[in-house]
Amino acid sequence: MKLLFSKPVTKFFLFCCIGMIVHSCMPAFLKPAKQFVLNSDSIAVMVIPADNILYTNIKTDLIEGYDSLSAEQKLVAMKEQSLLLSQLTDSIIYVSFVNKYIYYLTQTSLKVYTPEYDYLFESNKKKSVVKLAQIECEEYFDKVRDEDVINDAYLVYNDAYVNAFAFNLWVECTSPYNDTATVLFANNRITDKHYGWFEQDWNGNVLYYENNVELDLQRVENFLNKLAERYANYTFDYLLNNYINSTMATPEIPDSSSLHFDIQSGKFYYVDDNYKFIKL
């Protein structure tokens, strides 16, 4: 699930929204959830950007003489002989993702700091450190199967291969309610825009056609912008659930689920592993 922020959220707005949905018949864990959201503007979050970014090209079979290259030569070749990684730079990643992640985090009620403001961060009583420990950009081929039933009689299919780009993020996070750093992980991917279909000619032969729009740098940058917003929301939700777990012996949240707070509507939702950080 995704949150959209147009401006920093005020405590008055949160109070009005949550007050309309939290009542006595609600599950017990909504009480601490409400408390966390209403008091989240007292939590200071230090965001530490990643020191370096990994670029991994899994299309090694396209690199001539790959197996005979040294480890250093392989790293150079994997980036240079790629569709997207050859165009990506650390600066693009920082502008499209890291800086945007920090921005979207400031649009919540959390107080967000970066290392140059460490002296201000330390003056807060409730502190959380979010270290973007590792960022990895992967490029590879993904298999897509197109299927159809011809004349309502038999199944035909074709396996096509499309370019794929994956963004992997490892986060080390402490919270005001747990001093031990927890390693969190999230990843998402995009591929070429692919459309494949089957047609039958006059002779009864089944023909396969496909139309692909290849991934480009602009789509990757837009993708990273969206992930920055999504992962900022994951961070808020992680701190929310951490607080609930620290205040209740049995939070009673369904297995494999976490609580998500939608700031626009002021409502809480259950989310599965596809919409949150995964603990490692």
Outline where the language-model segments fall.
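Solvent-exposed loop/turn segments at secondary-structure junctions
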Residues: 52-54, 136-139, 190-191
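Short, solvent-exposed, polar/charged sequence segments at loop or secondary-structure edges
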Residues: 90, 94-150
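Bacterial N-terminal signal peptides that target proteins for export
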Residues: 2-13
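Surface-exposed short loop/turn segments
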Residues: 123-186, 271-280
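Bacterial N-terminal signal peptides
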Residues: 12-24
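Mixed-charge, low-complexity intrinsically disordered segments
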Residues: 58-90, 142-164, 192-211
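A structural "domain/chain start" motif
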Residues: 25-106, 244-280
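Short secondary-structure boundary motifs at beta->alpha junctions and helix caps
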Residues: 81-88, 174-246
